[in-house]
Swiss-Prot record:
Keyword terms of this UniProt record: Transposable element
Taxonomic superkingdom: Bacteria
PANTHER family: TRANSPOSASE RV3428C-RELATED
Name this protein carries in UniProt: Putative transposase Rv3428c
Integrase catalytic domain: residues covered: 40-220
GO molecular function: nucleic acid binding
Coiled coil segments of this chain: none
Keyword ATP-binding: no
Pfam families linked: Mu-transpos_C_2 (PF22483), rve (PF00665)
Region (Disordered): 390-410
A GO biological-process term: DNA integration
PROSITE patterns for this protein: INTEGRASE
Phylogenetic classification of the source organism: Bacteria, Bacillati, Actinomycetota, Actinomycetes, Mycobacteriales
Family under the similarity heading: Belongs to the transposase IS21/IS408/IS1162 family.
């Protein structure tokens, strides 16, 4: 109406108020106005068949723990038959909070309704659609655990869940206004008490003067789905793209995946202390959860890319022991001081066995020790020249060539 009135003033010079425009439309388009206002009454709802869920803003709260003012929202679940409700104040509305509120509500009711009618929040619905909504994976996992159905309301249609929309003002006025809380936990416990002792005992005209709590106890409680024997483990899902370092970001941490998945978008499931990464329905990596930093499994890299990291000083000592005593002595010299700085040289010496064999490498190491220069370059030169069994000393590199190794110690 405001837009029409503004256009009349700007484009046609007609000084018409919004109320005048509204009366004119009601007079000349009475049938269209009446058609738009028609509502179809819902039939009766069976006990235990439906719960309606939504968030409503309560207000600002000073948190003594952080000395900051934060916004507080109320998670509200209303059983459509008895009108019995559950309220849980929260300061976060992420996936974990959304699912945790559902778990608390089911425990409060000691059962699960057959259908959950929720708003199209991203924590519950990834892609709203009238006929085939895409449910968030964490929420779908919760629904599967409790054997219930998620049935999102139509987008921008609050009348699809009037049982939870109407009590929001009542919750804010009766529970929240004029009260002070020392902690979020105290606030949540107070909300549970209020839901039972205040909201549950009010008389409702919609229930023909009955009280929601009494209606719930008498009829609806036994109609709810029983709670499963195993408690639900809170999970969160995220999606990201694998970087060229083979890591995927989950929260504030990075987790490695097999290198062949570089550039692909993968889903990550976080539950407790475990992070699982999925390609489709297959688990491709599992890590211990970290608050930040990197969690790297070197088996996710091509072998040639991780040789330095996999062939540790311990590996070098063990491999040299398998080759022979002379090789073991050479590697021990490398590892005696500043092992990490001489690791490349030790890896290089042991790598010569791939081309020349263990016997020749052992003989070359013995010859290098004999001439007093057991460096990588000298050992390689002996093998290339084929003089590891020569009676006379082979020609060795200049002293400067020992920079890549560690000379023998007296």
């Amino acid at each position: 109406m405001a837009t029409i009135a503004q256009r009349l003033r700007d484009d046609h010079g007609v000084a018409a108020s919004e109320s005048s425009v509204r009366r004119w439309i009601a007079t000349h388009f009475a049938e269209e106005v009446a058609r738009e206002r028609v509502t179809v009454p819902r039939g009766p709802v069976d006990a235990g068949s439906e719960a309606q869920i939504d968030y409503g803003r309560l207000g600002m709260w000073f948190d003594p723990a952080t000395a900051r003012r934060v916004a507080v929202w109320a998670f509200v679940m209303v059983l459509a038959f008895s009108r019995h409700l559950f309220v849980r104040p929260v300061i976060r509305m992420d996936q974990t909070a959304w699912c945790a509120c559902h778990v608390a509500a089911f425990e409060f009711f000691d059962g699960v309704p057959a259908r959950l009618v929720c708003d199209n929040l991203r924590t519950g619905v990834d892609k709203p659609d009238l006929y085939d909504p895409q449910i968030n994976r964490s929420y779908a996992e919760l629904a599967s655990h409790y054997a219930t159905l998620v049935d999102p309301a139509r987008a921008r249609k609050p009348k699809d869940k009037p049982r939870v929309e109407r009590p929001m003002t009542y919750v804010r006025d009766s529970f929240w206004k004029g009260r002070e809380f020392d902690s979020l936990a105290q606030m949540q416990q107070a909300a549970v008490t209020w839901s039972t002792e205040v909201a549950g005992l009010r008389y409702l005209r919609a229930l023909e003067g009955a009280q929601p709590l009494r209606m719930f106890e008498a009829v609806e409680q036994q109609a709810l789905i029983a709670l499963p024997p195993r408690a639900f483990e809170l999970t969160s899902w995220s999606i990201g793209t694998v970087g060229v370092d083979t890591h995927l970001k989950v929260g504030k941490a990075l987790y490695s995946v097999p290198w062949r998945l570089i550039g692909q978008r993968l889903h990550a499931r976080t539950a407790g202390d475990v992070v699982q990464i999925f390609a489709g329905n297959d688990v491709v990596a599992t890590h211990v959860r970290r608050p930040s930093g990197r969690s790297t499994d070197f088996s996710h890299y091509p072998p040639e890319k991780i040789a330095f990291h996999m062939r540790t000083p311990t590996w070098c000592r063990h491999t040299a022991e398998l080759v022979g005593p002379a090789s073991q002595q050479v590697i021990a010299e490398f590892m005696r001081d500043n092992a990490i700085h001489h690791l490349r040289s030790a890896q290089g010496v042991l790598g010569l066995r791939d081309k020349h064999g263990c016997d020749r490498l052992e003989a070359a190491c013995a010859r290098a020790i004999e001439v007093g220069d057991p460096s990588y370059r000298t050992i390689k030169g002996i093998l290339v020249a084929g003089t590891e069994h020569a009676a006379n000393e082979p020609t060795t590199s200049s002293p400067a060539s020992t920079a890549g190794g560690v000379p023998a110690r007296p």
